[in-house]
Regions:
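Sec-dependent bacterial lipoprotein signal peptides
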Residues: 2-29
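Long, intrinsically disordered, low-complexity segments
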Residues: 31, 291, 295, 302-307, ...
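Membrane-proximal, proline-rich intrinsically disordered regions
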Residues: 31-78, 546, 553-580
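Aromatic-residue-lined binding/catalytic grooves and analogous aromatic/hydrophobic interfacial grooves
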Residues: 32-34, 165-169, 194, 198-210, ...
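Conserved, well-structured interaction surfaces
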Residues: 57, 92-163, 184-195, 202-214, ...
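Surface-exposed intrinsically disordered loops and tails
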Residues: 190-193, 207-215, 259-280, 345-363, ...
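Flexible, polar/acidic helix-loop-strand segments at domain edges
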Residues: 339-410, 432, 451-452
Length: 580
């Protein structure tokens, strides 16, 4: 899909006042100029009020235009700092420094002003849109107002995850003085950011998203962030797990627009010959899976194009020299899974359970979970000549595309719903999402009555919408076969009975959480989630090693740089980019 956002708002005087450019010229010792406006780049009317339908449409498109600039960093900052991706020898120095958490110098991926450009656009829109205007009994601009609030909250969450503590600015900055004063205020941490925007968004959760039809070649419904899912994320980061589970549940089970669990999977074609697979797994191309994305341009002339294909894949533009590749850690996580078959036995009422071999396969990526094989391919075209300017290896990561950067998709929301349920005290229900799928019939079979009673309608699914049938399966089955029958993939149990039920729940919660985080790696690899997933649990447990250990070992146990990197990452202050 090719997306073109260069709509004619570029020609309309007065509508680009919200495309307000900001830049950074700060050092570690001084940050007074971080938000200084570059007023020469825009033409605006300071007292202009947004009171025409075209104002709101073009202004929202302008905000998306600014979001395009930070879109690649959603993936890069989440993966290059994580353990599933590592830079190659061909990588640019900025990627190598990012991977090593070496932030002493300038880095093209550390441009905080780009985030504040989005935020200032949002702040201006929210301050000037006429939310009282009605026509024929319908509020004209409330949908855009709510959508822009979501853009702002999401952007601030990205800031907090990447920088740790940042200035929290909720009003538009129109002068250099205002920008300098904003920089002198106390900085807000992740929890403060989340609490602020939980309160900011909640009153508007019932407002429908704007309906613009097609914008270029994009269906505009995918351009807007689902507010309930975003509130779930904010509550999850804030440690408000019951509320997070509520928001995720209500989003997924909306009777007017329910979000079903994935029906896509990749499987071995049969259980006797392991030389062919059946693959319907295309999560970033399926309209049933995609919830929200940032569209990218197809030509530099039109605006911002994604550089991810040239960083992750072999292309003619990079002479096939990819700069980022799958790590040894990613391969190990995938290979550690056990692929299960459940076969019918002729004339019998029971089924036969088999497991895929772990050696002798035609490709090493086929060991364990098959999602890795589905997404990653590395092919050799012979040895490289000393005189050739082209790489003899070709890498293709199918999840990486130029058309859009996906920021919400259904399976990842289900996994965060599982994470919230588990931390809220419902590990059986959370585990059901991984192993069986989730609907009322499954929950009644797989979750004990005590937990079902305690969880109440947090795990209630309308049987008319979420109906159990033979195609229902848990998320782990997307790449690991018939997980419902897998005897090696089970709910953790203590070796001896514990004194109380609550003791057992407390024992299970961190272990189920580990399984969820592993599943997030298998399902969400190369999409930008990994570092933040590790960080969220490390902060929750007050255990920096939860992040430091896997990230430092991304290249394998024998990596000579692992010890120094682990020592650096044991201090959470080193996880974040500096504000310069």
């Amino acid at each position: 899909m090719r997306t073109k956002i260069n709509i004619e708002y570029r020609r309309l005087k007065g509508l680009f006042f919200i495309l307000y450019s900001l830049f950074i010229s700060m050092t570690l010792a001084s940050c007074a100029d971080m938000l200084e406006p570059e007023s020469d780049l825009v033409e605006f009317e300071e007292d202009h009020t947004l009171n025409h339908a075209t104002d709101s449409v073009y202004s929202v498109m302008g905000i998306i235009n600014k979001m395009q600039i930070i879109a690649d960093r959603v993936v890069l900052l989440g993966e290059v700092r994580g353990d599933l991706v590592q830079p190659t020898s061909a990588a640019n120095s900025d990627l190598k420094h990012l991977s090593a958490f070496d932030f002493d110098g300038d880095n093209r991926y550390n441009q905080i002003s780009d985030y504040y450009a989005v935020i200032n656009n949002c702040n201006y829109f929210l301050a000037h849109i006429d939310t009282a205007m009605e026509r024929r009994g319908r509020n004209l601009f409330m949908r855009e107002y709510a959508a822009v609030k979501s853009y702002r909250a999401w952007t601030y969450l990205q800031l907090a995850l990447n920088y740790g503590e940042v200035p929290l600015i909720l009003n538009p900055l129109m002068t250099e003085r205002e920008a300098r004063e904003a920089m002198n205020q106390p900085r807000a941490d992740i929890k403060t950011i989340c609490e602020t925007f939980i309160n900011d968004l909640t009153p508007y959760v019932g407002v429908n998203l704007p309906e613009y039809g097609n914008v270029g070649n994009s269906n505009s419904e995918y351009l807007f962030i689902p507010m309930r899912a975003l509130l779930g994320d904010l509550c999850l980061w804030a440690g408000r797990y019951q509320e997070a589970a509520r928001w995720y549940h209500d989003f997924l089970t909306d009777k007017y627009d329910p979000v079903m669990m994935s029906r896509q999977k990749i499987t071995w074609a049969n259980s006797t010959q392991f030389n062919a697979i059946y693959n319907s797994y295309t999560p970033l191309k399926s309209t049933s899976e995609i919830l929200c994305y940032i569209p990218m341009e197809s030509r530099v002339f039109d605006g911002t194009i994604s550089q991810l294909p040239n960083l992750f894949n072999s292309t003619t533009e990079n002479n096939y020299f990819y700069e980022l590749t799958s790590s040894a850690s990613m391969a190990k996580i995938s290979a550690d899974q056990i692929y299960c078959f459940e076969n019918d036995i002729p004339g019998a009422t029971t089924k036969d359970t088999l497991y895929a071999p772990r050696t002798g396969l035609i490709r090493s990526e086929l060991t364990g979970d098959l999602r890795y094989y589905s997404n990653y391919d590395l092919t050799s075209y012979g040895s490289k000549s000393d005189y050739s300017e082209y790489n003899s290896y070709r890498q293709q990561i199918d999840k990486i595309g130029a058309e859009r950067i996906i920021i919400y998709r259904s399976t990842m929301v289900y996994l965060r719903y599982a994470e919230a349920l588990n931390r809220a005290g419902y590990p059986q229900s959370a585990f059901a999402i991984l192993k069986y799928g989730i609907c009322d019939d499954i929950l009644k079979q797989r979750v004990d009555p005590v937990e079902l009673s305690l969880a109440g309608d947090l795990v209630s699914f309308d049987p008319e919408l979420f109906r159990f049938d033979g195609s229902y399966f848990g998320i782990h089955s997307i790449g690991s076969g018939d997980s419902h029958a897998n005897q090696y993939y089970t709910l953790p149990q203590p070796t001896e009975a514990l004194p109380t039920r609550q003791d057992t729940v407390a024992y299970q919660i961190p272990l189920v959480e580990d399984m969820i985080i592993t599943e997030m790696a298998l399902e969400g690899a190369f999409e930008g989630y990994r570092f933040n997933d590790l960080m969220r649990v490390a902060l929750r447990r007050n255990d920096p090693a939860y992040l430091a250990d896997p990230v430092s070992r991304r290249k394998g146990e024998a990596d000579p740089e692992a010890t120094g990197l682990r020592q650096k990452l044991m201090d959470p202050k080193n996880w974040y980019l500096p504000l310069h």
